[in-house]
Design a protein with these regions (language model features):
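Terminal accessory/targeting
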Residues: 1-85, 103-112
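Active-site beta->alpha N-cap acidic-glycine motif
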Residues: 57-149, 165-169, 176-177
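Short, hinge-like loop/turn segments at secondary-structure boundaries
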Residues: 130-133, 156-159, 196
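A short acidic, helix-capping loop that chelates divalent metal ions and anchors anionic groups
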Residues: 145-152, 210-213
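Alpha-helix N-cap and loop-to-helix initiation/capping positions
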Residues: 152-159, 218
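Soluble catalytic domains of enzymes that build or remodel membrane lipids, polysaccharides, and related
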Residues: 158-167, 172, 193-194
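His/Asp/Glu-enriched short active-site or ligand-binding loop at hydrolase and phosphoryl-transfer sites
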Residues: 192-219
Length: 219
């Protein structure tokens, strides 16, 4: 069983962020206490989230220092001493795979987090309800999936995440946790600051399974 979970994690993860089943408070605390890794300061202008990989068995590094990221409640990797894999999925459009993923997760008793955009909420409300019913967490990936680092005012930033929150709560009748993932991994210091001011925790990733090209989908 443990071996299969590791295989599932590598096969289907879009990023390493957190385990929904452990609870929001435990999650955030574990990230705050974890050994975040990085190499550069947070960019003041638009930056694409990037990773560096060292020797096999070591954690990757991000292109921002842990200290700078932590200032804005931003994380991408957990404590390397814990043998834990955090599964996340970015849901923009439904291509028939989400149901299969949910079935696999349920079969092997694995919890995950799904970052959703407005289009997914509008077109697949039943899948969103199923995510919640089966114990997964649903995070915020913005309504229109824009380059959020180009948004200069808090009100416009807030509308992108608030519209997702309102629709999610209308669909599920539950409060949405304030977990945010920047579309395309594009961010700036101002971007992360606005998210924090709105009460959000920002999560990047430490490994990505390249499945976002709609003309080159896995078969």
């Amino acid at each position: 069983m443990k071996k299969w979970k590791r295989i599932l994690a590598v096969a289907v993860m879009l990023a390493l962020v957190f385990c929904a089943g452990r609870g929001s408070a435990v999650l955030v605390k574990s990230w705050q206490n974890g050994g975040l890794l990085g190499v550069n300061a947070v960019a003041s202008t638009t930056e694409n989230w990037g990773l560096g990989f060292g020797e096999s068995g070591t954690q990757p590094t991000g292109n921002a220092t842990p200290e700078e990221l932590r200032k804005y409640n931003t994380y991408f990797i957990g404590n390397g001493d814990d043998k834990v894999i955090y599964l996340t999925f970015d849901c923009g459009y439904e291509n028939g795979n989400t149901e299969k993923i949910l079935e696999a997760l349920k079969k092997h008793d694995v919890k995950a987090t799904f970052f959703v955009v407005g289009h997914f909420l509008e077109t697949s409300p039943d899948l969103v309800r199923k995510m919640v019913e089966e114990g997964h967490t649903v995070g915020n990936h913005t309504y229109h999936h824009p380059d959020m680092s180009e948004i200069a005012d808090v009100s416009s930033f807030q509308k992108e995440v608030e519209d997702v929150k309102l629709l999610y709560e209308e669909i599920t009748d539950k409060e949405m946790v304030k977990y945010y993932r920047p579309p395309q991994g594009k961010y700036s210091e101002s971007n992360l600051k606005m998210a924090k001011e709105l009460g959000y925790y920002t999560f990047f990733w430490s490994l990505a399974y390249v499945d976002w090209y709609d003309t080159d989908q896995p078969t």
